[in-house]
Amino acid sequence: MNTEAAGRRVHVIQGEFKVVNDPDIVLSTILGSCVAACMRDPAAGVGGMNHFLLPGSATSPSSGADATRYGVHLMELLINGLLKQGARRDRLEAKIFGGARTIARFSNVGEQNAAFARQFLMDEGIRIVGESTGGDHGRKLEYWPSSGRARQYALTGVEAQRALQMDQRPAVPKPAESPIEFF
């Protein structure tokens, strides 16, 4: 039996990243104008995915819920998460997905997201081994970090509307830090 087909699914939502070293895990997400970067170190057997809404911030938030929307923050978190799990920066390889223009009358944030991801990876010296960005439809993405295999499905109709709604929904806010400790 193909272990990739039977893998345990872990969904990555907007504003999140996941790093795994379990060969039975399949990371999945649904993308409209958002972009997901999938990275791995094939020698270390570790990989992960992020899912960001916007490329970067002029104010570069360092903490709080706002930071999780931005690619600049989530790309750093993903890379650092991989390094903490034994990956080496010089062996990292990446695939990028998403960046669709889901509504013609809106600015093309999807194209900006994809361009940001490409430039960020190039600046960091991380090889891009695959890319599927742009277009007019959202995507459902599955990524097997252990092998680097990725599979996507074009979303149409109801699925596309759901992806669009997810892209327009704000990222889940993180709880505010407080000096109060509860027991």
Curated annotation (Swiss-Prot):
Keywords: Chemotaxis, Hydrolase. Its EC number is 3.5.1.44. It is an enzyme of class 3 (hydrolase). The keyword Hydrolase applies. It comes from the Bacteria. The keyword Hydrolase applies. InterPro entries: CheD-like_sf (IPR038592), Chemorcpt_Glu_NH3ase_CheD (IPR005659), Cytotoxic_necrot_fac-like_cat (IPR011324). This is Probable chemoreceptor glutamine deamidase CheD. It comes from Rhizobium meliloti (strain 1021) (Ensifer meliloti). The gene is cheD.
